[in-house]
């Protein structure tokens, strides 16, 4: 609470990953699949408890908080309610949780050992809808490179993380095409959305970051939306 009070005093945004440390000790999302595979689960409650705690602290301190990597349908519903209440909160979702679900663990594929874990299809659908309607402010790569030796291990022993920076833009476009989301909204989730979350922390770039404005920095990326690689 004191950290949020200090941050609020100086106008800083606090970045938090909403996951209860005790309930989040598992290695896969709780559910029938994790049970069948004999993997310790991370329940949705791990995210919900953390979100409730964070929102109560935001109510008392009025500090701005950014929630990193929301992963569940119930979690994004709490975020939607918090925003409707007027709490100064923003959030993002990773490309992993936007495109994959728990069945993509395959036969203990340690490349899918991620945090937050891949959840059920209903969670993915809720996240995709929330990104489309603006409840989720940004799409992130959650780029966490892991040494190959740390991944070629039994699933529960493998290190958490995966590379994704090189896939962020293409997966944003793929999501837009699959869900009928306009290209402008899709690109905003990886440009203007993240820049808005960062705000004044971008310094002199804050006036033009993530968008094209006269006199702004010409930070451009050219892509072929029809190309495959």
Per-segment meaning from a language model:
Residues 36-62, 111, 138-139, 144-226:
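His/Asp/Glu-enriched, well-ordered alpha-helical/loop segment
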Residues 1-139:
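Histidine/acidic residue-rich metal-binding segments in metalloenzymes
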Residues 15, 22, 175, 228-229:
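A residue-identity detector for tryptophan
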Residues 73-76, 104-106, 120, 124, ...:
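A generic structural micro-environment signature
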Residues 74-76, 97-100, 146-149, 196, ...:
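Flexible loop/turn segments at secondary-structure boundaries
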């Amino acid at each position: 609470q004191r950290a949020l009070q200090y941050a609020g005093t100086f106008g800083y945004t606090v970045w938090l990953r909403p996951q209860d440390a005790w309930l989040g000790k598992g290695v896969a999302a709780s559910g029938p699949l994790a049970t069948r595979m004999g993997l310790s689960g991370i329940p949705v409650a791990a995210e919900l408890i953390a979100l409730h705690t964070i929102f109560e602290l935001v109510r008392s301190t009025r500090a701005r908080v950014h929630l990193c990597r929301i992963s569940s349908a119930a979690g994004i519903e709490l975020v939607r309610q918090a925003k409707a209440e007027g709490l100064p909160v923003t959030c993002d979702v990773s490309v992993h949780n936007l495109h994959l679900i728990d069945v993509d663990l395959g036969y203990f594929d340690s490349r899918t050992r991620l945090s937050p874990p891949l959840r059920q299809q209903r969670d993915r659908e809720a996240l995709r809808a929330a990104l489309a309607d603006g409840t989720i402010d940004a799409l992130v790569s959650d780029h966490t490179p892991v040494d190959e030796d740390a991944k070629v291990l039994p699933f529960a022993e493998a290190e958490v993380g995966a590379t994704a920076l090189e896939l962020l833009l293409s997966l944003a476009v793929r999501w837009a095409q699959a869900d009928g989301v306009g290209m402008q909204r899709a690109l905003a989730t990886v440009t203007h959305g993240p820049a808005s979350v960062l705000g004044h922390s971008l310094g002199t770039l804050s006036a033009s970051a993530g968008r094209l404005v006269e006199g702004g920095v010409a930070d451009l990326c050219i892509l072929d939306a029809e190309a495959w690689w």
